[in-house]
Regions:
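A short helix->beta-strand "capping" segment at the edge of beta-propeller domains
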Residues: 45-72
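Asp-box/WD-like beta-propeller blade repeats and closely related beta-sheet repeat scaffolds
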Residues: 136-182, 196-202
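Conserved blade-ending motifs and adjacent loop-strand segments that build the rim/top face
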Residues: 243-264, 298-322
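Repeated scaffold domains used in trafficking and secretory/extracellular systems
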Residues: 74-77, 118-123, 158-165, 205-213, ...
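Short coil/turn segments at the loop-to-beta-strand junctions that recur within blades
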Residues: 69-70, 109-116, 155-161, 200-205, ...
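Short beta-strand elements that form the blades of beta-propeller/WD-repeat-like
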Residues: 84-89, 129-135, 168-175, 216-232, ...
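C-terminal motif of bacterial Sec signal peptides marking the signal peptidase cleavage site
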Residues: 24-26
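Blade-loop segments of beta-propeller domains
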Residues: 66-70, 103-129, 135-136
Length: 354
């Protein structure tokens, strides 16, 4: 009887060991698969090099924004849908224009604490046929229809700098990451926290990038955390590493926690990412200069360097649409602007890539 029990325990122990080993192998295989799927972009041949515009840009669309005599402040952010252009300016006004003509549709500046009002408009995103506006001060999201009619709002409980609509709610960039609430926060459609990801201990002055989320033409959402060499793809299971940049000997150390540290190190660090068609574009800062890297995911072609400043239309992309990079000028401050147009305070440029 005793021998039978010992054998039974022995076989149970052997079975558990086998299951444990198989589990470890599965984790290792999954890790290997993730590493294989992670695309590393090597950025080392860029110093003192100009990127010829014809090498990366196929065409440029100009959208002259007709403001109809209304004052437009400096542009803070832009969203473009299939039929509309939305502009948030630093005078706290939200604008709607027709796309691609730039004809004026509506301007709102509903500043206050009442229903449908905001205090400090900060960021915008499109989703579910609505325009969502972030009010930084009140930690609120306001929803509008295509022509800026107010529909609804909700509040979230943490300071955020950027956000984007996803299928089952929103992703936020949390300014004050803690052990309990990490840098990227996933909420439902009512602003209730579902989960948070990507722990971070860096100081606030390390958050250089204005935009931390982009959506490609297929609807995939990508996440660029502040001061990061990695871009993450949003999935039902959370963020998964998708791309990584490697600056070789100029790569900054992982333990940098303040802007002073990175400035003193004179290493390169990313300040923005875009994913348009089959291109990954990142702008980065090194030794007092802003550089760009274009990576073609189809053929592996790379173009690295700084933008040609002799061109009439400046290449300073700030945002992206489904099919191009978006830059802008304030026409009153730009002597090279032609043709001059009445009631056109600003012009957007959509750069289409080769």
């Amino acid at each position: 009887m005793l021998l039978t029990m010992n054998l039974k325990h022995y076989f149970i122990a052997i079975t558990l060991c086998i299951l444990y080993i198989l589990n470890l192998m599965g984790c290792k295989n999954q890790q290997d698969a993730n590493e294989k799927d992670l695309l590393t972009i090597h950025i080392e041949d860029y110093e003192n090099k100009i990127i010829p515009r014809p090498a990366v840009i196929s065409s440029i669309d100009t959208i002259a924004l007709n403001t109809c005599g209304n004052f437009m402040g400096d542009i803070k952010t832009v969203c473009i849908s299939d039929s509309m252009v939305y502009v948030l300016d630093r005078a706290n006004a939200v604008w709607a224009f027709k796309f691609p003509t730039g004809d004026f549709v509506k301007r709102i500046r509903n500043v206050g604490h009442g229903n449908g009002e905001y205090v400090s408009a900060w960021a915008m995103t499109l989703g579910d046929s609505l325009l969502f506006l972030m009010d930084f001060d009140t930690k609120s999201i306001l929803a509008y229809d295509a022509v800026l009619n107010y529909k609804s709002s909700f509040r979230y409980g943490f300071p955020a700098m950027d956000f984007i609509k996803v299928k089952d709610g929103f992703l936020f960039l949390n300014l004050l990451a803690t052990e309990k609430l990490h840098r990227i926060v996933h909420t439902n459609n009512l602003g209730e926290v579902q989960q948070s990801y990507l722990p971070s201990k860096m100081s606030l002055d390390m958050i250089y990038n204005e935009t931390s989320f982009v959506r490609d033409k297929n609807g995939e959402v990508y996440i660029f955390p502040p001061f990061s060499n990695e871009i993450y793809r949003w999935t039902s299971g959370g963020p998964k590493p998708a791309f990584r940049t490697d600056f070789g000997r100029n790569t900054a150390k992982d333990n940098v926690k303040s802007s002073y540290d990175i400035t003193e190190s004179e290493r390169a660090f990313n300040t923005g990412f875009f994913i348009v068609d089959h291109h990954i574009i990142n702008n980065f800062y090194h030794s007092g200069k802003t550089y760009y890297s274009f990576y073609n995911m189809k053929d592996g072609r790379q173009d690295q360097g700084y933008a040609d400043t002799t061109e009439v239309i400046p290449f300073v992309p700030r945002w992206q649409s489904s099919n191009g990079l978006i830059g802008y000028i304030l026409t009153n401050d730009y002597d090279k602007w032609k043709p001059q147009k009445d009631s056109c305070d600003a012009a957007l440029f959509v750069f289409h890539l080769k």
